Amino acid sequence: MMGRRGSSWCRWWVALLVLAVAADAVGCTSVSYDDRSLVIDGQRRIILSGSIHYPRSTPEMWPDLIKKAKEGGLDAIETYIFWNGHEPHRRQYNFEGNYDVVRFFKEIQNAGMYAILRIGPYICGEWNYGGLPAWLRDIPGMQFRLHNEPFENEMETFTTLIVNKMKDSKMFAEQGGPIILAQIENEYGNIMGKLNNNQSASEYIHWCADMANKQNVGVPWIMCQQDDDVPHNVVNTCNGFYCHDWFPNRTGIPKIWTENWTGWFKAWDKPDFHRSAEDIAFAVAMFFQKRGSLQNYYMYHGGTNFGRTSGGPYITTSYDYDAPLDEYGNLRQPKYGHLKELHSVLKSMEKTLVHGEYFDTNYGDNITVTKYTLDSSSACFINNRFDDKDVNVTLDGATHLLPAWSVSILPDCKTVAFNSAKIKTQTSVMVKKPNTAEQEQESLKWSWMPENLSPFMTDEKGNFRKNELLEQIVTSTDQSDYLWYRTSLNHKGEGSYKLYVNTTGHELYAFVNGKLIGKNHSADGDFVFQLESPVKLHDGKNYISLLSATVGLKNYGPSFEKMPTGIVGGPVKLIDSNGTAIDLSNSSWSYKAGLASEYRQIHLDKPGYKWNGNNGTIPINRPFTWYKATFEAPSGEDAVVVDLLGLNKGVAWVNGNNLGRYWPSYTAAEMAGCHRCDYRGAFQAEGDGTRCLTGCGEPSQRYYHVPRSFLAAGEPNTLLLFEEAGGDPSGVALRTVVPGAVCTSGEAGDAVTLSCGGGHAVSSVDVASFGVGRGRCGGYEGGCESKAAYEAFTAACVGKESCTVEITGAFAGAGCLSGVLTVQATC
């Protein structure tokens, strides 16, 4: 009897356990690969992905960004993991706010998308110090990204922390989560041969792969830009503007493009880079023509370098990147829509592309036809790599005209469904509109307060003293942009000198006996510069205070962490009229990081702190000054920016949230690419090949993003500015980002769409002409006007958010030679 009960109970328990295991397995996804593609749940898949970096937006923005990515035809979201954001101090972690990475991945999962986890933990990304914490420099024996125990111990500790967080939240595919790939290290192959220690570099990269695989994440590990000395247990991948001619280092693994650069980052002294929708589509189409399987746009949404996160040095606060979604999350048209059309066509051919046999036929040096066949179906690509001429290509008896630098895709090898150079999507021009809050005054009313510099005008009360000029990052652990170097000397009688300081900057302010006597900053990418200023010493003790400031730390290159910053080594000299120098380099220097108001956290407006502001005449061009104003949040849901034109350089906060560094006084350089734009030919971000640049000769960044979640509706919001270099706040204003003009074009038989989006309606149709030859969207001129087209679009579109009109032969005007109709409307 007891035996039967025991046996029955055992069978019941086993059955319950089986059910529990089965229930736990529901939704679990297997991920493997072969030479054609990733294999997800036993099915070969083409994956279209886009990079969205969670710290470069806010949690409130994430669902909308991810939704738009999915609606744009993407399957996956790719992101780096930002080590120095998550571990700003050793073993002190931050996973809150826009660093809540688990929440970000859950948003991806909720949208029904896959995710690609790029741990690094070195990431480059134009992020401060490439994502590596500055405190690593404090650890004895530390060598970044080489085979040494101090670095590898810290790297493994952080990697394991991130992996365990993802496992605990069931984020990996085998747990039912969205993560289908994980990356270790980043672009190591670009620097591996430049480290002067090939053995250590090789041992390190193989250690990385072994360490990663021991994490048992259940999905493949990848390494990007690792074409040589590739560990056997990772998949190497490509980064670049074009990856069609690249193939992995061995057979049996798929062709993956982890970074297709949709534009380029911006530096304070450079104009805005624009990569055309035609060229990106051309690159993507060629990649899949030549056996590509997974392609990721870097970036799909660039976002904002809030706080002190921008790298470089000299990377701007905006990380817009000319991505399909702009810095604020708006659709960048026609780039977003043109790529969406491409994605739809590629997905319609997925089975044929990943299973079919393929045949390449060359029609000369720059023309290739690729045919994929599977059973009775076929799909074809025709590419024309000539950048200066259109060509006719005959395929299966039919002739197809290909514009220069384009790819045509024929899902049935008969009819062209997509050509990379022929854009059907509208163009949208976004504008900055004045604040429309009901109670908002015409201009902001300011109070101001000087930064308290007096504690730093002597060489007393420092953190420590040293008889040498030290490197800034090591000394400050990058806890502030600012580091004070202070010393004193006794002088007999009065004397006139020239103060000479050699520094690796990035900025320098010099004070003698409490007075600002000179300032300078590095220019043209050369971060070694000199400050020379006349100075008078008085009889007795004289104080010299030098304030060195950084503008983002270097994030890329071999041994980039060894690039010195600050007045390291100097020399610092006082030179008299005869050329005789007093060398102060080995004097007793007192060091202190940061400014007084940083220590008091004035930006947080804490209850115990009283703002001792002056409400009288507002000083302008006064360095080291705080300005404060309140404003009503702009009405509606449009993105908000603050226009800081008139200011020089500093930092801005809204309601205690750091918007980032500002520097609108820095003018973008004039470059040859500012005056020409042609999608044809290989895109370059450097050298003679640059083109399609805008903003030359203008403020490098005038507008700064204020996310809606930073604002309080219906109550006063606080804007706080720290003006470091001296500017004029009188023109500062809040604005909203709205569609200004929308434009489209087409020929007879085409159905074209105009959409303002975001709840905005078309207010007028301004142009409806054939053969428009001058201007850009928002400023088109000329052409042969069509009254019939104007009336049709006015009737269909005005007062509506979106409208679609078919172009008919009835629109053609008498004597109009062109068959292409251009329509421009105002939102």
From Swiss-Prot:
GO terms for biological process: galactose catabolic process; plant-type cell wall modification. Its EC number is 3.2.1.23. It comes from the Eukaryota. Glycans are attached at N198, N249, N260, N366, N392, N502, N520, N578, N586, N615. Keywords: Apoplast, Glycoprotein, Glycosidase, Hydrolase, Secreted, Signal. Residues 746-827 form the SUEL-type lectin domain. PROSITE patterns: GLYCOSYL_HYDROL_F35 (PS01182), SUEL_LECTIN (PS50228). Residues 1-25 form the signal peptide. One of its GO terms (cellular component) is vacuole. One of its GO terms (molecular function) is beta-galactosidase activity. It catalyses: Hydrolysis of terminal non-reducing beta-D-galactose residues in beta-D-galactosides. It is an enzyme of class 3 (hydrolase). It is found in: Secreted, Extracellular space, Apoplast. The active site is at E187 (proton donor), E259 (nucleophile). Belongs to the glycosyl hydrolase 35 family. This is Beta-galactosidase 1. It comes from Oryza sativa subsp. japonica (Rice).
